[in-house]
Amino acid sequence: MTHTPSFDLSDIKSTLSTNVLHADDAYALENDVAPPIHISTTYTYPGTPDTLQPFTKLAEEDFPYYARISGNNVDRAEASLSSVLGAPSVVYSSGLAAIYGLLSYLNPKHIAVHKPGFGGYSGTIQIIARINRLTGLETSFIDGKCDAIGEGDVIWLETPLNPLGIAFDIPFYKELAKKKGAILVVDSTFAPPPIQDALVLGADYVVHSATKYLAGHSDVLAGVTASKDRSKILDLKADRAYLGTILHPQQAFLLLRSLRTFPLRIAKHSENGFLVAQHLNKLATDEQFATSLGIDSSLILEVYHNSLQTKEFVAKNLTGGHASCFSVLLKSDTVAKHLCCELKYFHHATSLGSVESLIEWRRMTDSKIDPRLVRLSIGIEDAADLIADLNRVFASLS
């Protein structure tokens, strides 16, 4: 039987690695060390004729009664996610479901987003387009002013930005939102805690595609929204029940399984991403170094990575390392396509944040992006092997 934990996570002073392993302990129903998968869609009501209580409001119950509303595997995954994100969380069947759930709940008249073609998750734009059909939601683009934003509107900040991997200043946009009476939502998929804690930096809500680093094995489709305001999360859970976007028990089980190793994985991702980005940037900027490896440095025009940004706010936002997903602008689309297809240790595939390294010619999924751009998601292989693989293909193209 699902039940409310007897402890408050805020009282636990242990580290992330410990918390993520034990945050869901109070939800254990059996003595299994590995949580079982509960696939039942309906549950027996507890109680006797004298203790049964009629329905009043959909909220967190002390027992599950229908899988569209709650279930043990989902409860456990949310407890673990809350320990990572440092706030109450609600998990969904995908990142897009999390985005739709939050926007339908906030119901703004206007939203500021990143300009298509420059960057930003295309799925967010598609969700906004569909909400526009229902409510007339207006859209403008994020800049240093967001003049069109007013009371109750939303600034949807994605940082680091997909696909480039460059960071934006969360506290700056928090102050901007505050002055306008607006709501700041941060999509922090590219940099989950401990790399970047968007809620601590001032976001009202943080959204993640849990498919990426949080699950991290290319076998889970999930999304999560977190907020310091627990009442808002309870509202979102109630909405989720009627939107039909709860996570399937098996996916929740796999997500929880993956979260156990998240602190170890994200540290390796961060380290490897930094090393590979720095190496590629050196190839692009140090002709003598590139030549010594048999590589034509003109093949790489620019490397976009948050470790290469010089503005002071970057280090203040990304306090726990660097994002491991970033983009490289190459000499031509021909070079881009050959690079993606000829690497040994990189899968030519979309997505990011998994243990295996991925590379993508971005025109495969974004028709507005520069055809010379490739996106790399650096996995947890040995960085030296990944660098050697890249060197090999660049040398063959020189």
Swiss-Prot record:
Gene3D superfamilies (UniProt xref): Aspartate Aminotransferase, domain 1 (3.90.1150.10), Type I PLP-dependent aspartate aminotransferase-like (Major domain) (3.40.640.10)
A cellular-component GO term for this protein: cytoplasm
Biological process, per Gene Ontology: transsulfuration
Pfam families given in the database record: Cys_Met_Meta_PP (PF01053)
Required cofactor(s): pyridoxal 5'-phosphate
The keyword Lyase is annotated on this UniProt entry: yes
Recorded GO MF terms: carbon-sulfur lyase activity; pyridoxal phosphate binding
Family: Belongs to the trans-sulfuration enzymes family.
Protein name: Uncharacterized trans-sulfuration enzyme C23A1.14c
